[in-house]
Amino acid sequence: MAAPRPPPARLSGIMVPAPIQDLEALRALTALFKEQRNRETAPRTIFQRVLDILKKSSHAVELACRDPSQVENLASSLQLITECFRCLRNACIECSVNQNSIRNLDTIGVAVDLILLFRELRVEQEALLTAFRCGLQFLGNIASRNEDSQSIVWVHAFPELFLSCLNHPDKKIVAYSSMILFTSLNHERMKELEENLNIAIDVIDAYQKHPESEWPVLIITDLFLKSPELVQAMFPKLNNQERVTLLDLMIAKITSDEPLTTDDIPVFLRHAELIASTFVDQCKTVLKLASEEPPDDEEALATIRLLDVLCEMTANTELLGYLQVFPGLLERVIDLLRVIHVTGKETTNIFSNCGCVRAEGDISNVAEGFKSHLIRLIGNLCYKNKDNQDKVNELDGIPLILDNCNISDSNPFLTQWVIYAIRNLTEDNSQNQDLIAKMEEQGLADASLLKKVGFEVEKKGEKLILKSTRDTPKP
């Protein structure tokens, strides 16, 4: 008498053939797992069967890696692999029981090994890309909100999978691998990332190439920028474009509608140290823009962006105090403003007030704003800080700031920041007020210039008094 046939597995009231032998059966499972009730009632044995098909089909990929001529024979195997990954991907959606069952079969290790083989093939046929993408989606879903799965994914995927996928020409593969990285990273694993900085740099490059993708930007803003150790280790190794990208996202974080939290402040104080020290060391690279030789716009733009970050940081009251006493920062800003100002007056160059029309996005526009932001930063550093107010006076910074306003009628933003800086320099500082009043009396600052920046000088008896004529602009 023949042995009885095994009963078909029951999946939430739907009959599924016990031995999953073909593509149509896998597709049926994939469709069933789109519904939560089917995922929650799936028999555990079904995942072993899917894994068996996955392993069997992966042999064809292994063969193609050893013998490229076999790539043409991958079609049926790739279809099965794709559907296995889709099935497992769907089964993991918001279902920790299935995540655990699939993980405990060592499916994660099999999937990662297979995905690495895909990258090794270097064949960009659509069927291979589809299998590649579905495999990454499965890894993302099995790790989602499941710390045990995240740990196993990290063990198998780091660093090779991320090094292979984050710079892949297919943007979906970049996005899905970024999703896995974002899902798997935690505080301890960030330390491992510090020892594999190429992965962190690849994330920044991925954001540059695919700014519309949410995962790279989430990794940078929600993870990288919360790790000052990683940023400090990574920053010197970034090229100028990558630095600008990172600094732009740092500015976006500081100026976001959501203010920095109490947890963010200590982290951004560490960032402030890095940004300020780098600016003090490298800010004179901007002077290359005034040379006759073709300038390195990217290097200058990176330095200009450092200044932009410092302006936004000093506009934050929680970060301002630290930067107001940062060694050499105020002195270097005044020195740089003086050199740029003199250079612009003596020769015709990018810092000259030539009033020429420039293309949108031209480095010339950025350079023009550089002077404005130097003055803005001086104003911020002097906000309610008498030591810095006096230091600017000692360094002859007040006449320098006023002279910039005198020659820059074409730059209303510069005039705005001159007004702001002079207000902060003279607030509760009679010595600086007297200096400006005496400059007007001696003809070193004419009345029309002072009026333009919001002041006028009154003479009461033998005493000169500097009076404000307008409200202080917001920083």
From Swiss-Prot:
Protein name listed in UniProt: Ataxin-10
General function of this protein: May play a role in the regulation of cytokinesis. May play a role in signaling by stimulating protein glycosylation. Induces neuritogenesis by activating the Ras-MAP kinase pathway and is necessary for the survival of cerebellar neurons. Does not appear to play a major role in ciliogenesis.
Keywords of this entry: Cell cycle, Cell division, Cell projection, Cytoplasm, Cytoskeleton, Methylation, Phosphoprotein, Ubl conjugation
Source organism of this protein record: Macaca fascicularis
GO cellular component: centriole; ciliary basal body; cytoplasm; cytosol; midbody; perinuclear region of cytoplasm
Subunit relationships: Homooligomer. Interacts with GNB2. Interacts with IQCB1. Interacts with OGT.
InterPro entries for this protein: ARM-like, ARM-type_fold, Ataxin-10/CTR86_families, Ataxin-10_domain
PANTHER family the UniProt entry points to: ATAXIN-10
Phosphoserine, modified sites: S12, S77, S430
Modification after translation (UniProt): Polyubiquitinated. Phosphorylation at Ser-12 by AURKB promotes the association of ATXN10 with PLK1. Phosphorylation at Ser-77 and Thr-82 by PLK1 may play a role in the regulation of cytokinesis and may stimulate the proteasome-mediated degradation of ATXN10.
Main location: cytoplasm
Modified residue annotations for Omega-N-methylarginine: R10
Location in the cell: Cytoplasm, Perinuclear region; Midbody; Cytoplasm, Cytoskeleton, Cilium basal body; Cytoplasm, Cytoskeleton, Microtubule organizing center, Centrosome, Centriole
Sequence positions bearing Phosphothreonine: T82
Family statement: Belongs to the ataxin-10 family.
Entry's Gene Ontology BP terms: cell division; neuron projection development; regulation of cytokinesis
